[in-house]
Amino acid sequence: MAIVSAIFSVMLIFLIIGTIIVIIFDSGDSATKIAWLLIITILPIIGLLLYFMVGINLRQSRYFKNKHKKFIDIFGQRANAQVHKLLFGHEKDHRVKKDYRTLTQLLSCDGSTRVTDGNGLEIITSGHRKFELLMEDLENAKEYIHMEYFYFRHDKGAQQIKEMLMKKAREGVKVRFIHENIANIDILPGYYNEMKKAGVMVEKFTKPRWPLINLVTQLNYRDHRKIVVIDGKIGYAGGMNISDDYFVKWRDTHMRITGNAVAGLQYSFLNTWITADGEIDDDFAKYFPMCADVGSAVKVNAEAARDTDIDLNEEDSEGNGIAEVLAKTPIQSLDMNFKFKNKDCLIQIVPDEPESRWGHIHMGAVWAVQHAKKYIYIQTPYFVPPEPMLQALQSAALSGVDVRVMVPKKADLFFMGPANRSYFKECLEAGVKIYERTGRFIHAKTFVSDDYLSEIGSANMDFRSFNLDYELVAYIYDTTVANVNKAIFLKDLEASKEVTLEDWERRPWYQKFSQRIIRLFAALL
Protein backbone atom coordinates (compact mmCIF):
# COMPACT_ATOMS: atom_id res chain seq x y z
CA MET A 1 0.00 0.00 0.00
CA ALA A 2 2.85 2.35 0.82
CA ILE A 3 4.33 1.83 -2.66
CA VAL A 4 0.97 2.41 -4.34
CA SER A 5 0.44 5.54 -2.28
CA ALA A 6 3.88 6.83 -3.16
CA ILE A 7 3.35 6.17 -6.88
CA PHE A 8 -0.02 7.92 -6.74
CA SER A 9 1.50 10.91 -4.97
CA VAL A 10 4.30 11.21 -7.53
CA MET A 11 1.84 10.93 -10.43
CA LEU A 12 -0.40 13.55 -8.83
CA ILE A 13 2.53 15.93 -8.37
CA PHE A 14 3.61 15.53 -12.01
CA LEU A 15 0.00 15.99 -13.16
CA ILE A 16 -0.35 19.15 -11.09
CA ILE A 17 2.95 20.54 -12.40
CA GLY A 18 2.00 19.68 -15.98
CA THR A 19 -1.43 21.27 -15.61
CA ILE A 20 0.05 24.41 -14.09
CA ILE A 21 2.44 24.70 -17.05
CA VAL A 22 -0.48 24.28 -19.47
CA ILE A 23 -2.45 27.00 -17.64
CA ILE A 24 0.51 29.41 -17.61
CA PHE A 25 1.11 29.03 -21.34
CA ASP A 26 -2.59 29.20 -22.20
CA SER A 27 -3.59 32.20 -24.32
CA GLY A 28 -6.55 33.07 -22.07
CA ASP A 29 -6.88 36.11 -19.84
CA SER A 30 -4.85 36.41 -16.65
CA ALA A 31 -7.85 36.49 -14.30
CA THR A 32 -9.02 33.08 -15.50
CA LYS A 33 -5.54 31.58 -15.23
CA ILE A 34 -5.03 32.92 -11.71
CA ALA A 35 -8.41 31.52 -10.62
CA TRP A 36 -7.50 28.06 -11.91
CA LEU A 37 -4.06 28.15 -10.32
CA LEU A 38 -5.67 29.11 -7.03
CA ILE A 39 -8.26 26.35 -7.02
CA ILE A 40 -5.72 23.69 -8.06
CA THR A 41 -3.39 24.82 -5.29
CA ILE A 42 -6.10 24.79 -2.61
CA LEU A 43 -7.95 21.65 -3.76
CA PRO A 44 -5.55 19.70 -6.03
CA ILE A 45 -7.67 16.66 -6.91
CA ILE A 46 -10.99 18.51 -7.22
CA GLY A 47 -9.25 21.37 -9.02
CA LEU A 48 -7.69 19.03 -11.58
CA LEU A 49 -11.01 17.31 -12.26
CA LEU A 50 -12.79 20.63 -12.69
CA TYR A 51 -10.08 21.99 -14.95
CA PHE A 52 -10.17 19.00 -17.30
CA MET A 53 -13.97 19.13 -17.33
CA VAL A 54 -14.62 22.84 -17.79
CA GLY A 55 -11.33 24.72 -17.80
CA ILE A 56 -9.46 23.65 -20.90
CA ASN A 57 -9.39 26.51 -23.40
CA LEU A 58 -10.67 25.13 -26.69
CA ARG A 59 -11.12 28.52 -28.39
CA GLN A 60 -8.34 27.66 -30.82
CA SER A 61 -8.62 23.87 -30.60
CA ARG A 62 -8.52 21.64 -33.64
CA TYR A 63 -11.95 20.27 -32.75
CA PHE A 64 -13.74 23.61 -33.01
CA LYS A 65 -11.65 24.73 -35.97
CA ASN A 66 -12.56 21.59 -37.92
CA LYS A 67 -16.24 22.02 -37.12
CA HIS A 68 -16.19 25.63 -38.28
CA LYS A 69 -14.20 24.76 -41.40
CA LYS A 70 -16.86 22.22 -42.33
CA PHE A 71 -19.49 24.96 -42.35
CA ILE A 72 -17.29 27.41 -44.27
CA ASP A 73 -16.58 24.77 -46.93
CA ILE A 74 -20.25 23.88 -47.36
CA PHE A 75 -21.32 27.52 -47.39
CA GLY A 76 -18.66 28.40 -49.96
CA GLN A 77 -19.81 25.60 -52.25
CA ARG A 78 -23.56 26.17 -52.04
CA ALA A 79 -24.06 29.91 -51.52
CA ASN A 80 -24.14 32.02 -54.68
CA ALA A 81 -22.56 35.42 -55.26
CA GLN A 82 -25.78 37.22 -54.38
CA VAL A 83 -25.86 35.59 -50.94
CA HIS A 84 -22.21 36.48 -50.33
CA LYS A 85 -22.89 40.09 -51.29
CA LEU A 86 -25.91 40.27 -48.98
CA LEU A 87 -23.94 38.96 -46.00
CA PHE A 88 -20.46 40.35 -46.52
CA GLY A 89 -20.81 43.33 -48.84
CA HIS A 90 -19.49 46.71 -47.65
CA GLU A 91 -21.99 48.76 -49.64
CA LYS A 92 -24.08 49.85 -46.65
CA ASP A 93 -21.24 50.82 -44.30
CA HIS A 94 -21.24 54.40 -45.59
CA ARG A 95 -24.76 54.89 -44.23
CA VAL A 96 -23.50 54.43 -40.68
CA LYS A 97 -22.37 57.63 -38.96
CA LYS A 98 -18.71 58.27 -39.64
CA ASP A 99 -17.67 57.91 -35.99
CA TYR A 100 -19.04 54.35 -35.91
CA ARG A 101 -17.63 52.95 -39.16
CA THR A 102 -14.53 51.59 -37.48
CA LEU A 103 -16.88 49.60 -35.21
CA THR A 104 -18.58 48.00 -38.21
CA GLN A 105 -15.15 46.98 -39.49
CA LEU A 106 -14.12 45.58 -36.09
CA LEU A 107 -17.26 43.50 -35.79
CA SER A 108 -16.73 41.89 -39.20
CA CYS A 109 -12.95 41.38 -39.00
CA ASP A 110 -13.20 37.59 -38.72
CA GLY A 111 -15.75 36.89 -41.41
CA SER A 112 -18.88 38.04 -39.58
CA THR A 113 -21.69 39.71 -41.47
CA ARG A 114 -21.70 43.39 -42.41
CA VAL A 115 -24.24 46.17 -41.96
CA THR A 116 -27.61 45.64 -43.66
CA ASP A 117 -30.37 48.10 -44.49
CA GLY A 118 -34.01 47.66 -45.42
CA ASN A 119 -34.90 46.29 -41.99
CA GLY A 120 -38.04 46.48 -39.91
CA LEU A 121 -37.60 46.02 -36.18
CA GLU A 122 -39.91 45.28 -33.29
CA ILE A 123 -38.49 45.51 -29.78
CA ILE A 124 -40.37 43.24 -27.37
CA THR A 125 -40.25 43.53 -23.60
CA SER A 126 -43.15 41.19 -22.87
CA GLY A 127 -43.02 37.41 -22.75
CA HIS A 128 -46.73 37.29 -23.59
CA ARG A 129 -46.27 39.49 -26.63
CA LYS A 130 -43.27 37.51 -27.88
CA PHE A 131 -45.21 34.26 -27.48
CA GLU A 132 -48.20 35.61 -29.41
CA LEU A 133 -46.09 36.98 -32.25
CA LEU A 134 -43.99 33.84 -32.52
CA MET A 135 -47.00 31.51 -32.57
CA GLU A 136 -48.63 33.62 -35.28
CA ASP A 137 -45.48 33.66 -37.42
CA LEU A 138 -44.96 29.91 -36.96
CA GLU A 139 -48.55 29.27 -38.03
CA ASN A 140 -47.97 31.28 -41.22
CA ALA A 141 -44.68 29.57 -42.15
CA LYS A 142 -44.71 28.21 -45.72
CA GLU A 143 -41.29 26.69 -46.42
CA TYR A 144 -39.17 26.24 -43.32
CA ILE A 145 -38.73 27.06 -39.65
CA HIS A 146 -35.29 27.25 -38.06
CA MET A 147 -35.22 27.40 -34.25
CA GLU A 148 -32.25 27.47 -31.86
CA TYR A 149 -32.67 27.93 -28.10
CA PHE A 150 -30.53 27.69 -24.99
CA TYR A 151 -33.48 26.87 -22.72
CA PHE A 152 -36.58 25.12 -24.05
CA ARG A 153 -38.49 24.47 -20.84
CA HIS A 154 -40.95 21.59 -20.47
CA ASP A 155 -43.84 23.87 -19.49
CA LYS A 156 -47.17 25.06 -20.88
CA GLY A 157 -45.84 27.67 -23.31
CA ALA A 158 -43.07 25.41 -24.61
CA GLN A 159 -45.58 22.60 -25.12
CA GLN A 160 -47.73 24.83 -27.32
CA ILE A 161 -44.73 25.83 -29.42
CA LYS A 162 -43.64 22.19 -29.65
CA GLU A 163 -47.10 21.19 -30.88
CA MET A 164 -47.03 24.00 -33.43
CA LEU A 165 -43.64 22.82 -34.74
CA MET A 166 -44.95 19.27 -35.09
CA LYS A 167 -48.11 20.52 -36.81
CA LYS A 168 -46.11 22.51 -39.37
CA ALA A 169 -43.77 19.55 -39.99
CA ARG A 170 -46.78 17.34 -40.74
CA GLU A 171 -47.99 19.99 -43.20
CA GLY A 172 -44.72 19.68 -45.12
CA VAL A 173 -42.84 22.67 -43.72
CA LYS A 174 -39.20 21.80 -43.04
CA VAL A 175 -38.62 22.35 -39.33
CA ARG A 176 -35.09 22.34 -37.92
CA PHE A 177 -34.67 22.59 -34.15
CA ILE A 178 -31.43 22.89 -32.13
CA HIS A 179 -31.47 22.59 -28.36
CA GLU A 180 -28.58 23.16 -25.98
CA ASN A 181 -27.78 19.81 -24.41
CA ILE A 182 -26.56 20.57 -20.89
CA ALA A 183 -29.03 23.40 -20.23
CA ASN A 184 -31.93 21.03 -21.01
CA ILE A 185 -30.46 17.90 -19.46
CA ASP A 186 -33.58 17.43 -17.30
CA ILE A 187 -35.74 16.86 -20.40
CA LEU A 188 -36.00 13.16 -21.25
CA PRO A 189 -35.19 11.90 -24.79
CA GLY A 190 -38.83 10.97 -25.35
CA TYR A 191 -39.72 14.66 -25.48
CA TYR A 192 -37.57 15.15 -28.57
CA ASN A 193 -38.38 11.73 -30.05
CA GLU A 194 -42.01 12.79 -30.26
CA MET A 195 -40.93 15.80 -32.32
CA LYS A 196 -38.80 13.61 -34.60
CA LYS A 197 -41.69 11.22 -35.23
CA ALA A 198 -43.76 14.18 -36.41
CA GLY A 199 -41.04 15.12 -38.90
CA VAL A 200 -39.16 17.79 -36.97
CA MET A 201 -35.40 17.59 -37.53
CA VAL A 202 -33.85 17.81 -34.06
CA GLU A 203 -30.17 18.22 -33.20
CA LYS A 204 -28.51 18.78 -29.87
CA PHE A 205 -25.52 20.99 -29.20
CA THR A 206 -23.05 19.36 -29.18
CA LYS A 207 -22.41 15.69 -29.80
CA PRO A 208 -18.70 14.93 -30.29
CA ARG A 209 -17.67 11.37 -31.07
CA TRP A 210 -15.37 10.80 -28.12
CA PRO A 211 -16.66 10.79 -24.51
CA LEU A 212 -13.79 12.86 -23.08
CA ILE A 213 -14.25 15.60 -25.66
CA ASN A 214 -18.00 15.32 -25.12
CA LEU A 215 -17.51 15.95 -21.40
CA VAL A 216 -15.24 18.95 -21.91
CA THR A 217 -17.17 20.70 -24.68
CA GLN A 218 -20.67 20.18 -23.35
CA LEU A 219 -19.93 21.37 -19.84
CA ASN A 220 -17.99 24.47 -20.76
CA TYR A 221 -18.97 25.52 -24.29
CA ARG A 222 -22.69 26.11 -24.62
CA ASP A 223 -25.04 27.41 -27.25
CA HIS A 224 -26.54 30.44 -25.49
CA ARG A 225 -28.34 31.86 -28.53
CA LYS A 226 -32.08 32.31 -28.95
CA ILE A 227 -32.77 32.41 -32.70
CA VAL A 228 -35.79 31.78 -34.89
CA VAL A 229 -35.82 32.21 -38.69
CA ILE A 230 -39.04 31.72 -40.65
CA ASP A 231 -38.93 31.44 -44.45
CA GLY A 232 -35.82 33.64 -44.47
CA LYS A 233 -38.00 36.72 -44.04
CA ILE A 234 -38.78 36.91 -40.32
CA GLY A 235 -36.28 36.47 -37.52
CA TYR A 236 -36.24 36.55 -33.73
CA ALA A 237 -33.26 37.08 -31.43
CA GLY A 238 -32.47 38.52 -28.03
CA GLY A 239 -32.57 37.38 -24.43
CA MET A 240 -35.82 35.40 -24.18
CA ASN A 241 -35.73 31.62 -24.05
CA ILE A 242 -38.81 29.43 -24.34
CA SER A 243 -40.11 29.42 -20.78
CA ASP A 244 -43.19 30.47 -18.84
CA ASP A 245 -40.85 32.46 -16.57
CA TYR A 246 -41.09 35.33 -19.07
CA PHE A 247 -44.86 35.61 -18.59
CA VAL A 248 -44.70 36.71 -14.95
CA LYS A 249 -41.33 36.38 -13.20
CA TRP A 250 -38.77 37.81 -15.65
CA ARG A 251 -38.33 41.09 -17.58
CA ASP A 252 -36.39 40.64 -20.80
CA THR A 253 -35.84 42.27 -24.18
CA HIS A 254 -36.20 40.51 -27.51
CA MET A 255 -36.44 41.47 -31.20
CA ARG A 256 -38.57 40.56 -34.17
CA ILE A 257 -36.70 41.49 -37.34
CA THR A 258 -37.83 41.63 -40.95
CA GLY A 259 -35.61 42.45 -43.89
CA ASN A 260 -32.03 41.80 -44.90
CA ALA A 261 -30.68 41.43 -41.34
CA VAL A 262 -32.57 38.13 -41.15
CA ALA A 263 -29.83 36.77 -43.41
CA GLY A 264 -27.35 37.27 -40.57
CA LEU A 265 -29.54 35.25 -38.22
CA GLN A 266 -29.85 32.57 -40.88
CA TYR A 267 -26.09 32.45 -41.41
CA SER A 268 -25.55 31.99 -37.69
CA PHE A 269 -28.19 29.27 -37.42
CA LEU A 270 -26.83 27.30 -40.37
CA ASN A 271 -23.34 27.48 -38.87
CA THR A 272 -24.55 25.89 -35.64
CA TRP A 273 -26.80 23.42 -37.45
CA ILE A 274 -24.03 22.11 -39.68
CA THR A 275 -21.63 22.08 -36.72
CA ALA A 276 -24.14 19.79 -34.99
CA ASP A 277 -24.13 17.54 -38.11
CA GLY A 278 -27.63 18.57 -39.11
CA GLU A 279 -28.98 17.75 -42.56
CA ILE A 280 -29.20 20.68 -44.97
CA ASP A 281 -30.43 21.15 -48.55
CA ASP A 282 -28.08 21.80 -51.46
CA ASP A 283 -29.90 24.95 -52.56
CA PHE A 284 -28.74 27.69 -50.18
CA ALA A 285 -30.38 30.47 -52.19
CA LYS A 286 -33.79 29.74 -50.68
CA TYR A 287 -32.38 30.33 -47.20
CA PHE A 288 -31.37 33.88 -48.13
CA PRO A 289 -34.21 35.54 -50.08
CA MET A 290 -33.55 39.17 -50.98
CA CYS A 291 -36.40 40.61 -48.97
CA ALA A 292 -37.93 43.38 -51.06
CA ASP A 293 -41.12 43.39 -49.00
CA VAL A 294 -39.42 44.31 -45.74
CA GLY A 295 -41.30 45.77 -42.81
CA SER A 296 -41.61 49.51 -43.06
CA ALA A 297 -42.14 50.21 -39.37
CA VAL A 298 -40.15 50.02 -36.20
CA LYS A 299 -42.35 48.95 -33.33
CA VAL A 300 -41.75 48.73 -29.64
CA ASN A 301 -44.02 46.26 -27.93
CA ALA A 302 -44.13 45.90 -24.19
CA GLU A 303 -46.51 44.24 -21.76
CA ALA A 304 -49.93 43.41 -23.25
CA ALA A 305 -49.26 45.47 -26.36
CA ARG A 306 -52.67 45.03 -27.96
CA ASP A 307 -54.92 48.01 -27.50
CA THR A 308 -52.80 51.13 -27.43
CA ASP A 309 -50.88 52.11 -30.56
CA ILE A 310 -49.14 55.46 -30.80
CA ASP A 311 -47.96 56.83 -34.13
CA LEU A 312 -45.33 59.50 -33.59
CA ASN A 313 -45.75 62.44 -35.93
CA GLU A 314 -42.93 63.76 -38.09
CA GLU A 315 -41.83 66.24 -35.43
CA ASP A 316 -41.20 63.27 -33.14
CA SER A 317 -39.81 60.98 -35.84
CA GLU A 318 -36.53 60.64 -33.94
CA GLY A 319 -38.32 59.06 -31.01
CA ASN A 320 -37.98 62.02 -28.67
CA GLY A 321 -41.55 61.70 -27.44
CA ILE A 322 -41.17 58.15 -26.20
CA ALA A 323 -39.88 59.03 -22.76
CA GLU A 324 -42.83 61.35 -22.15
CA VAL A 325 -45.33 58.66 -23.15
CA LEU A 326 -43.62 55.98 -21.10
CA ALA A 327 -43.53 58.30 -18.10
CA LYS A 328 -47.31 58.04 -17.95
CA THR A 329 -47.28 54.25 -18.23
CA PRO A 330 -47.39 52.12 -15.05
CA ILE A 331 -44.21 50.11 -14.63
CA GLN A 332 -46.35 47.03 -14.00
CA SER A 333 -47.89 47.14 -17.46
CA LEU A 334 -45.76 49.03 -19.97
CA ASP A 335 -48.63 48.43 -22.38
CA MET A 336 -47.70 50.81 -25.18
CA ASN A 337 -47.01 49.86 -28.77
CA PHE A 338 -44.96 52.52 -30.56
CA LYS A 339 -44.92 52.61 -34.35
CA PHE A 340 -42.37 54.54 -36.37
CA LYS A 341 -43.44 54.86 -39.97
CA ASN A 342 -41.07 54.46 -42.91
CA LYS A 343 -38.10 53.39 -40.80
CA ASP A 344 -35.14 51.69 -42.39
CA CYS A 345 -32.90 50.38 -39.62
CA LEU A 346 -29.22 49.69 -40.13
CA ILE A 347 -28.53 46.40 -38.35
CA GLN A 348 -25.36 44.33 -38.06
CA ILE A 349 -25.82 40.79 -36.77
CA VAL A 350 -22.76 39.68 -34.80
CA PRO A 351 -22.42 36.01 -33.81
CA ASP A 352 -19.49 34.85 -31.71
CA GLU A 353 -18.17 31.34 -31.17
CA PRO A 354 -15.34 29.67 -29.25
CA GLU A 355 -13.49 29.16 -32.52
CA SER A 356 -13.55 32.89 -33.30
CA ARG A 357 -10.03 34.23 -33.05
CA TRP A 358 -10.86 37.69 -31.80
CA GLY A 359 -14.03 37.58 -29.72
CA HIS A 360 -16.13 40.12 -31.60
CA ILE A 361 -18.78 40.70 -28.95
CA HIS A 362 -16.30 41.50 -26.19
CA MET A 363 -14.21 43.75 -28.43
CA GLY A 364 -17.30 45.47 -29.79
CA ALA A 365 -18.65 46.14 -26.30
CA VAL A 366 -15.32 47.60 -25.15
CA TRP A 367 -15.15 49.78 -28.29
CA ALA A 368 -18.68 51.07 -27.69
CA VAL A 369 -17.88 52.03 -24.09
CA GLN A 370 -14.58 53.67 -24.99
CA HIS A 371 -16.11 55.80 -27.76
CA ALA A 372 -19.25 57.00 -25.95
CA LYS A 373 -19.32 60.75 -25.32
CA LYS A 374 -22.60 61.43 -23.49
CA TYR A 375 -24.12 58.36 -21.86
CA ILE A 376 -24.02 54.56 -21.62
CA TYR A 377 -26.98 52.56 -20.29
CA ILE A 378 -26.46 48.82 -19.75
CA GLN A 379 -28.81 46.08 -18.61
CA THR A 380 -27.40 42.65 -17.76
CA PRO A 381 -28.40 39.88 -15.34
CA TYR A 382 -24.77 38.87 -14.82
CA PHE A 383 -22.23 41.63 -14.27
CA VAL A 384 -18.81 39.99 -14.11
CA PRO A 385 -16.83 42.16 -16.56
CA PRO A 386 -13.37 41.06 -17.68
CA GLU A 387 -10.61 43.55 -16.93
CA PRO A 388 -10.72 45.36 -20.33
CA MET A 389 -14.46 45.98 -19.94
CA LEU A 390 -14.16 47.02 -16.30
CA GLN A 391 -11.42 49.52 -17.12
CA ALA A 392 -13.40 50.86 -20.09
CA LEU A 393 -16.43 51.51 -17.85
CA GLN A 394 -14.26 53.21 -15.24
CA SER A 395 -12.49 55.34 -17.85
CA ALA A 396 -15.77 56.43 -19.41
CA ALA A 397 -17.23 57.46 -16.05
CA LEU A 398 -14.06 59.27 -15.02
CA SER A 399 -14.19 61.13 -18.36
CA GLY A 400 -17.61 62.54 -17.55
CA VAL A 401 -19.78 60.06 -19.47
CA ASP A 402 -23.04 59.15 -17.71
CA VAL A 403 -22.48 55.41 -17.20
CA ARG A 404 -25.35 53.41 -15.71
CA VAL A 405 -25.52 49.65 -15.16
CA MET A 406 -28.72 47.84 -14.16
CA VAL A 407 -28.63 44.37 -12.61
CA PRO A 408 -31.23 42.31 -10.73
CA LYS A 409 -31.66 42.83 -7.00
CA LYS A 410 -32.04 39.08 -6.57
CA ALA A 411 -30.12 36.80 -8.93
CA ASP A 412 -31.57 33.56 -10.27
CA LEU A 413 -28.36 31.70 -9.31
CA PHE A 414 -27.27 31.90 -5.68
CA PHE A 415 -23.62 32.64 -6.47
CA MET A 416 -24.30 35.33 -9.08
CA GLY A 417 -25.59 37.90 -6.59
CA PRO A 418 -22.27 38.06 -4.69
CA ALA A 419 -20.39 37.82 -8.00
CA ASN A 420 -22.24 40.82 -9.46
CA ARG A 421 -21.79 42.87 -6.29
CA SER A 422 -18.09 42.10 -6.02
CA TYR A 423 -17.55 44.62 -8.86
CA PHE A 424 -19.72 47.40 -7.43
CA LYS A 425 -17.09 49.21 -5.35
CA GLU A 426 -14.60 49.61 -8.21
CA CYS A 427 -17.36 50.95 -10.44
CA LEU A 428 -18.93 53.25 -7.84
CA GLU A 429 -15.57 54.78 -6.92
CA ALA A 430 -15.04 55.70 -10.58
CA GLY A 431 -18.48 57.28 -10.88
CA VAL A 432 -20.38 54.43 -12.55
CA LYS A 433 -24.00 54.42 -11.37
CA ILE A 434 -25.30 51.01 -10.31
CA TYR A 435 -29.00 50.16 -10.09
CA GLU A 436 -30.58 46.98 -8.73
CA ARG A 437 -33.97 46.20 -10.25
CA THR A 438 -36.51 44.86 -7.79
CA GLY A 439 -39.58 42.78 -8.54
CA ARG A 440 -39.27 40.88 -11.79
CA PHE A 441 -35.84 39.44 -12.52
CA ILE A 442 -34.14 41.58 -15.18
CA HIS A 443 -32.77 39.16 -17.78
CA ALA A 444 -32.33 41.74 -20.58
CA LYS A 445 -28.93 42.08 -22.24
CA THR A 446 -29.00 45.58 -23.73
CA PHE A 447 -26.69 48.51 -24.36
CA VAL A 448 -27.51 52.00 -25.61
CA SER A 449 -25.31 55.06 -25.97
CA ASP A 450 -25.38 58.60 -27.31
CA ASP A 451 -28.83 58.36 -28.94
CA TYR A 452 -27.47 56.27 -31.81
CA LEU A 453 -25.92 52.87 -30.97
CA SER A 454 -27.97 50.01 -29.52
CA GLU A 455 -27.05 46.42 -28.74
CA ILE A 456 -29.63 43.71 -28.06
CA GLY A 457 -28.77 40.05 -27.86
CA SER A 458 -28.03 36.95 -25.82
CA ALA A 459 -24.64 37.93 -24.37
CA ASN A 460 -24.28 38.81 -20.71
CA MET A 461 -21.50 41.08 -19.48
CA ASP A 462 -19.37 38.27 -18.09
CA PHE A 463 -16.43 36.01 -18.85
CA ARG A 464 -18.60 33.15 -20.08
CA SER A 465 -20.49 35.12 -22.73
CA PHE A 466 -17.36 36.92 -23.92
CA ASN A 467 -15.12 33.84 -24.09
CA LEU A 468 -16.87 30.49 -23.90
CA ASP A 469 -20.43 30.44 -25.20
CA TYR A 470 -22.01 30.67 -28.63
CA GLU A 471 -23.66 34.09 -28.55
CA LEU A 472 -25.36 36.56 -30.89
CA VAL A 473 -25.84 40.32 -30.61
CA ALA A 474 -27.54 42.76 -32.98
CA TYR A 475 -25.82 46.14 -33.32
CA ILE A 476 -28.38 48.73 -34.39
CA TYR A 477 -27.25 52.07 -35.79
CA ASP A 478 -30.38 54.18 -35.50
CA THR A 479 -31.42 57.27 -33.53
CA THR A 480 -35.05 56.23 -33.10
CA VAL A 481 -34.21 52.76 -31.82
CA ALA A 482 -31.62 54.22 -29.45
CA ASN A 483 -34.19 56.61 -28.00
CA VAL A 484 -36.58 53.71 -27.56
CA ASN A 485 -34.01 51.65 -25.70
CA LYS A 486 -33.03 54.63 -23.57
CA ALA A 487 -36.67 55.22 -22.65
CA ILE A 488 -37.17 51.57 -21.72
CA PHE A 489 -34.07 51.70 -19.51
CA LEU A 490 -35.28 54.86 -17.79
CA LYS A 491 -38.69 53.28 -17.26
CA ASP A 492 -37.06 50.26 -15.61
CA LEU A 493 -35.34 52.67 -13.24
CA GLU A 494 -38.73 53.22 -11.61
CA ALA A 495 -38.55 49.64 -10.34
CA SER A 496 -34.88 49.96 -9.35
CA LYS A 497 -32.89 51.25 -6.41
CA GLU A 498 -29.61 53.07 -6.91
CA VAL A 499 -26.64 51.67 -5.02
CA THR A 500 -24.52 54.43 -3.46
CA LEU A 501 -20.94 54.11 -2.33
CA GLU A 502 -21.90 55.18 1.19
CA ASP A 503 -24.54 52.47 1.49
CA TRP A 504 -22.19 49.97 -0.05
CA GLU A 505 -19.48 50.61 2.50
CA ARG A 506 -22.00 49.94 5.30
CA ARG A 507 -23.03 46.46 4.14
CA PRO A 508 -22.58 43.60 6.66
CA TRP A 509 -19.20 41.90 7.02
CA TYR A 510 -20.51 38.52 5.89
CA GLN A 511 -21.63 40.04 2.56
CA LYS A 512 -18.20 41.56 2.07
CA PHE A 513 -16.59 38.22 2.86
CA SER A 514 -18.79 36.18 0.48
CA GLN A 515 -18.31 38.70 -2.32
CA ARG A 516 -14.54 38.64 -1.98
CA ILE A 517 -14.46 34.84 -1.98
CA ILE A 518 -16.71 34.59 -5.04
CA ARG A 519 -14.65 37.27 -6.79
CA LEU A 520 -11.62 34.95 -6.72
CA PHE A 521 -13.49 32.57 -8.98
CA ALA A 522 -15.48 35.12 -11.01
CA ALA A 523 -13.65 34.24 -14.21
CA LEU A 524 -14.87 30.64 -13.90
CA LEU A 525 -18.59 31.38 -13.47
What residue ranges belong to the model's regions?
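N-terminal localization/anchoring segments of enzymes in phospholipid and broader phosphate metabolism
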Residues: M1-M363, W367, H371, S395, ...
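Glycine- and other small-residue-rich loops at beta-strand/loop junctions that grip anionic moieties
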Residues: F150, E180, P381-Y382, M416
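Helical hairpin unit composed of two closely spaced alpha helices linked by a short loop
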Residues: Y382-V403, P408, L413
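Histidine/acidic-residue-rich catalytic or RNA/ligand-binding cores of hydrolases
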Residues: E387-Q391, G417-A419, S449
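Active-site donor-binding acidic/aromatic loop of nucleotide-activated sugar
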Residues: I434-T438
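Catalytic-core elements of nucleic-acid end-processing and repair enzymes
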Residues: K445
